[in-house]
Structure formats: C-alpha cells, structure tokens
C-alpha cells in the first residue's frame, strides 16, 4: 500500500521529532504499519470510522490528546491527513 502524506500531516509528524517526542513519533509509525497489516478499521490505537462531514475517514489514538486521521483514496493509497490534535479540529 502506498502512503501519501498531506502537507499538514507531514508537518505534524516532523514536529514530534523537533519537539523531542520520539514516543509519539514511533507510535505513528507503528499505527501506519498496523493499518497496512490489518486494514483501516482493525488493530492497535482504537481505530474509529469517523462520521458526518468526516465520513470515509478513520482515526487512531496516538496519545491522550492526538489522533492519526487517515483514509484510503480512490486509488487504494493510504492518505495520512493529520497527526496532531483531535479529529474534531479538522
């Protein structure tokens, strides 16, 4: 599965490293590997299908306050949309 990063999500990922939060950075990598292995709605991080205006997207818990938000695009690629804050901030 090809992984595509939205610009905001890429900045989010790099901010964990810049701020010295290696634990959250490693968790994001683990979540992405798990999505590839187990699919979008199963596995670690409490996968959740989002609703309403976020329908078609999923989230997984990175830490207490941050969520990984992602979807599978029309070409079957995993698109990472956000790695910071909670999805209700989208």
Protein language model annotation of sequence segments:
Residues 27:
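Charged catalytic carboxylate motif
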Residues 2-4, 11-22, 44, 59-90:
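Enriched for short, Lys/Arg-rich terminal
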Residues 33-61:
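A short, surface-exposed loop/turn module that caps and links secondary-structure elements
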Residues 11, 30-33:
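Generic recognition of well-ordered alpha-helical segments
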